[in-house]
């Protein structure tokens, strides 16, 4: 009898990755153990994973070599390859020459241009690290500097080696993503490693339970779908404000400069603003003069005498800004710092959590004009031709240059809430306070029941370092908050710089003693991570601490990016999402209390606040949004008790409750922080309330499951989805699918001035109140994906394009031609072809000073090959996606476990979003697979189908007598009342054969049947998979028409 060998494995669900060039941990030689004249760094991938017990592992991979492809001549031999690689090594120099570890000739398809499935010749070239990888890439680019602006562009005709034009392929895809594609593992999925294929680290270097080194080849996908308990930390800070306005971490003299200019502008006789008056107003800031309109300044240097101020002012008056050579730096600094100082008029970061772009994000500001005349500061102020912004800028910079440095506003409170994913409530809460903090008798039981730990610190430094200490102690996998990437992280970092504890404060990684900073390549200064995101409301710069082993989720960014809300204030968002309907009430007038009964109490705790909405034809805030404190929660009766006797009218309205922030105003926060220990508890509880709100929001919208499913579908890590734009996920997905089809993606240079193309069509609405005639809606199921599939629109099916002007003159064409100027791949046997026509546009000015206007300048015809078997890359990807979504929805219908049902739902939504985004990315100039002709052809097909749907319905149901399923005969005269992108809205104007109108409910019954019939009729003449169908919510649509048109 033979016994099977049991192979032991370890399994982890991956969630974060730390990628860098460094010295081998396996060799353990350290920096000094290598030849300093050679590039000895390796490409290192640190993977973080969680097991079912909630323990974290650090898995180091050192043997994956970054690579890309270079398209070369189809006749190249091994000799040509060796000579070309030697040429590249020569370009790299002696230091990097050994960093190319492998190269070989391969045959692959290329993504762009139809070529009858031809295989082309490429060199696959691999490097030890990304430093050498990127250095070799520079050969294919040309650098320029125009007016001080650095620009790097792809060589238009490739890199010319001898007589061969060489082109880069697959070089813009992060090497980490290629590892996922090759090993077929998911960055948020389960992996397994054989225990005999791993090496345990000799010396502990992380805060993880386990530390391993292994080969990437030993990472295998685990057939597992267990739920893991991510540890989640939600934090929020409160800051002081010396002037009672928006907190500023590092202060200059802008407030004093603003006060002085406001005084000057209000003067009737401005000649009285002389040297004496100017000096008096500056000294008033230091308390030596009485000027009611001048705010006090708080210098770091204490007890500055009047004599010292006199000496400073004397030098200050001699200062001529135009002669100051360092003012260029000031101008640059101004662009970065204005986003903070411009918040002076905001009530508070908390009141404006995401509500205003200026408060929520560091938005780019226009450059202030510098003052170039030879004049001192007083003369600049007195110059009536000088702009106010310039005066303010020059005065602020001059005061900051000569007068003592000012104290910034301090971090006074940090709240932290910790919850394990899938648990029903947080397990620990912290309030870190600068100063004493005493719990009032009323809240002592609340503190015990919610495991609230209050930590008192005497200094701001102590507050910041305690935050780091708790982060290490609790060791969360996910760190969240509201607008933390726009305010909290940046404020804390700048305060740590100001008080000299930056390195200790930023040891927030899962790697022991790792300081979470990077060097800014422009300034050479150490900074926290910065990122730029583009949303519908504009372009924003974000700052956050990149913590290896911890995922940052800013819920303010999530809601701005993925939801359309009337407000993005935390108070509104909490009330909108964390809410439910009121079933009944018991009013206790004697004790001035009301018990509220509701099915769902998620997110509510004793001591938090709720507000109510009255819902009828519209939604109104009950008592103008008044907030009520919760005194008690009874889970057995599904009810909570509020601190007021409220007669909610459940007969007249549908009443909803919504979670609200603590009822503490901004000014109260600033004032209470400087009062008694009990007063400070009020602020601390408020701060902790915001932490709890964010935790419940994260759970309610289930952003974790949503992003995990998208991560696994597109093979991109969670932090890519949360911190980068939308393009990277589709780039990864398309690259993976191309790889499966032996196809490579080139690096493409985008033409930013190629005009654009026409989007979706909208029919002019026939406005009216449709009360008696039901309006039906028939739309196309997945219009753009279906159009790409049905017409085989793809980069690799495009045969040629011909562009004409408005006079039908051919002005340009593309496509491979032979010596006789014939298109090589046109009219091939076994292929059919589809031509798509669309208008071309340019942005033109009618006059030199007029605004640019999008103008039709001609048209373009694109020819796409229709394959005898299968589809081109993009349609094939879409077919896979639509098929996967259908299968997932089928599984969801069979699943009984609500948690798994939710996972399937998030999965099918991720597939839907990816499928619908593919067309858009084809037309996005920032896309890695930009192809305007495919996107423009897709919208052209969409417009054609929209008109087709309208024409079929209006044509086939025009004065036609139809017998319905119940035998009733009706006369139809279909009329389109509106149409948009993929939908046609129409009414049948039903009558009996005798000419009597059929209206209201009976008309609705007939309209539903006729609309379904019309959709089926139109679908018969369409290519698969295009379907024209009735919307399922036709009844709801009718009520919307009645209420809103």
Swiss-Prot record:
Q: Which Enzyme Commission number(s) are listed?
A: 2.7.7.7
Keyword set for this entry?
A: DNA replication, DNA-binding, DNA-directed DNA polymerase, Nucleotidyltransferase, Transferase, Viral DNA replication
Q: Which reaction does it catalyse?
A: DNA(n) + a 2'-deoxyribonucleoside 5'-triphosphate = DNA(n+1) + diphosphate
Taxonomic superkingdom = Viruses
Transmembrane helix keyword on record: no
Against SUPFAM superfamilies, the record matches this protein to:
DNA/RNA polymerases, Ribonuclease H-like
Q: Does the keyword NAD apply?
A: no
GO molecular function terms listed in the Swiss-Prot or TrEMBL record: DNA binding; DNA-directed DNA polymerase activity; nucleotide binding
- List the biased-composition ranges (Acidic residues): 335-348
Q: Which family does it belong to?
A: Belongs to the DNA polymerase type-B family.
The protein's matches in PANTHER family, at most eight in alphabetical order, are given as:
DNA POLYMERASE CATALYTIC SUBUNIT (PTHR10322), DNA POLYMERASE DELTA CATALYTIC SUBUNIT (PTHR10322:SF23)
Which protein is depicted?
A: DNA polymerase
Q: Which gene encodes it?
A: dpo
């Amino acid at each position: 009898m033979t016994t099977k060998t049991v192979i032991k494995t370890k399994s982890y669900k991956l969630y974060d990755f730390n990628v860098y060039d460094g010295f081998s941990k396996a060799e353990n030689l350290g920096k000094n153990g290598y030849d300093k004249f050679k590039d000895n760094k390796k490409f290192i991938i640190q993977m973080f994973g969680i097991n079912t017990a909630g323990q974290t592992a650090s898995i180091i991979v050192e043997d994956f070599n970054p690579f890309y492809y270079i398209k070369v001549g189809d006749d190249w031999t091994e000799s040509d390859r060796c000579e070309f690689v030697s040429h590249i090594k020569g370009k790299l120099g002696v230091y990097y020459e050994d960093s190319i570890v492998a190269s070989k000739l391969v045959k692959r398809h290329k993504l762009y241009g139809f070529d009858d499935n031809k295989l082309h010749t490429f060199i696959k070239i691999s490097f030890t690290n990304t430093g050498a990888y990127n250095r070799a890439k520079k050969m294919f680019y040309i650098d320029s500097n125009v007016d001080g602006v650095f620009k790097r562009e792809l060589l238009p005709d490739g890199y010319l080696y001898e007589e061969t034009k060489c082109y880069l392929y697959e070089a813009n895809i992060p090497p980490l993503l290629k590892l996922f594609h090759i090993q077929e593992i998911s960055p948020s999925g389960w992996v397994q490693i054989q225990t005999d294929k791993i090496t345990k680290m000799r010396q502990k270097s992380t805060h993880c339970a386990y530390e391993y080194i292994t080969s990437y080849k030993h990472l295998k996908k685990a057939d597992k779908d267990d739920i893991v308990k991510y540890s989640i930390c939600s934090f929020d800070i409160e800051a002081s404000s010396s002037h009672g306005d928006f907190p500023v971490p590092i202060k200059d003299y802008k407030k004093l400069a603003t006060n002085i200019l406001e005084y000057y502008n209000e003067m009737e006789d401005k000649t009285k603003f002389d040297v004496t008056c100017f000096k008096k107003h500056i000294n008033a800031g230091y308390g030596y003069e009485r000027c009611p309109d001048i705010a006090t300044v708080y210098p770091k240097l204490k007890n500055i005498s009047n004599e010292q101020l006199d000496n400073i002012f004397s030098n200050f008056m001699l200062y001529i800004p135009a002669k100051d050579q360092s003012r260029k730096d000031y101008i640059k600094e101004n662009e970065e710092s204005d986003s903070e100082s411009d918040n002076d008029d905001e009530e508070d970061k908390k009141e404006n959590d995401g509500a205003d772009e200026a408060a929520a994000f560091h938005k780019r500001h226009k450059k202030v004009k510098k003052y170039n005349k030879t004049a001192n500061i007083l003369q600049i102020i007195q110059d009536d031709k000088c702009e106010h912004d310039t005066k303010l800028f020059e005065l602020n910079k001059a005061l900051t240059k000569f007068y003592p440095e000012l104290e910034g506003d301090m971090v006074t409170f940090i709240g932290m809430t910790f919850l394990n994913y899938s648990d029903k409530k947080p397990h620990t809460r912290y309030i870190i306070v600068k100063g004493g903090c005493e719990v009032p008798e009323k809240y002592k039981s609340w503190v015990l029941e919610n495991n609230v730990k209050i930590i008192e610190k005497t200094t701001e430094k102590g507050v910041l370092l305690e935050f780091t200490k708790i982060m290490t102690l609790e060791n969360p996998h996910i760190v969240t908050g509201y607008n933390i990437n726009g305010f909290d992280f940046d404020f804390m970092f700048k305060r740590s710089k100001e008080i000299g504890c930056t390195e200790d404060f930023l040891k927030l990684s899962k790697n022991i003693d790792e300081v979470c900073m990077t060097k800014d390549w422009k300034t050479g200064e150490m900074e926290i991570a910065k990122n730029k995101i583009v949303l519908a409301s504009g372009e924003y710069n974000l700052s956050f601490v990149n913590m290896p082993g911890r995922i940052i989720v800013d819920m303010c960014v999530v809601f701005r990016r993925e939801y359309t809300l009337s407000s993005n204030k935390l108070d509104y968002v909490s009330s909108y999402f964390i809410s439910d309907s009121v079933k009944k009430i018991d009013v206790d007038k004697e004790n001035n209390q009301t018990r509220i009964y509701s099915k769902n109490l998620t997110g509510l705790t004793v001591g938090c606040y709720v507000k109510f909405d009255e819902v009828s034809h519209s939604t109104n805030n009950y008592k103008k949004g008044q907030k009520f404190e919760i005194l008690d929660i009874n889970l057995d009766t599904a009810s909570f008790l509020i601190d007021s006797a409220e007669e909610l009218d459940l007969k007249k309205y549908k009443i909803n409750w919504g979670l609200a922030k603590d009822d503490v105003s901004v000014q109260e926060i600033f004032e209470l922080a400087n009062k008694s220990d009990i007063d400070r508890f009020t602020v601390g509880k408020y701060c902790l309330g915001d932490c709890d709100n964010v935790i419940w929001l994260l759970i309610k919208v289930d952003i974790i499951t949503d992003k995990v499913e998208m991560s696994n579908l597109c093979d991109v890590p969670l932090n890519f989805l949360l911190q980068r734009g939308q393009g990277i996920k589709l780039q990864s997905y398309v690259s993976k699918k191309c790889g499966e089809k032996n196809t490579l993606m080139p690096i493409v240079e985008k033409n930013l001035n190629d005009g654009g193309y026409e989007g979706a069509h909208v029919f002019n609405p026939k406005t009216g109140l449709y009360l008696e005639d039901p309006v039906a809606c028939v739309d196309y199921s997945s219009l753009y994906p279906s159009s790409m599939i049905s017409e085989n629109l793809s980069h690799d099916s495009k045969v040629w394009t011909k562009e004409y002007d408005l006079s039908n003159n051919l002005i340009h064409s593309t496509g491979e031609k032979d010596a006789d100027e014939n298109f090589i791949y046109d009219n091939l046997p076994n292929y059919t072809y589809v031509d798509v026509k669309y208008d071309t546009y340019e942005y033109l000015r009618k006059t030199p000073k007029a605004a640019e206007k999008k103008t039709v300048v001609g048209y373009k015809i694109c020819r796409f090959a229709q394959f005898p078997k299968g589809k081109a890359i993009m349609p094939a990807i879409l077919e896979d996606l639509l098929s996967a979504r259908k299968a997932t929805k089928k599984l969801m219908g069979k699943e009984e476990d609500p948690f798994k049902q939710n996972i399937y739902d998030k999965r099918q939504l991720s597939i839907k979003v990816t499928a619908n985004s593919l067309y858009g990315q084809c037309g996005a100039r920032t896309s890695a697979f930009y192809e305007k002709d495919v996107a423009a052809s897709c919208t052209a097909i969409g417009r054609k189908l929209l008109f087709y749907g309208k024409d079929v319905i209006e044509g086939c149901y025009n004065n036609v007598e139809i017998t319905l399923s119940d035998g009733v005969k009706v006369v139809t005269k279909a009329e389109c009342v509106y149409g948009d992108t993929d939908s046609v809205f129409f009414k049948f104007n039903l009558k009996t054969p005798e000419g009597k109108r059929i209206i209201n409910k009976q008309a609705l019954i007939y309209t539903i049947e006729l609309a379904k019939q019309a959709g089926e009729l139109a679908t018969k003449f369409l290519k698969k998979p295009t379907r024209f169908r009735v919307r399922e919510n036709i009844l709801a649509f009718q009520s919307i028409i009645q209420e809103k048109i």
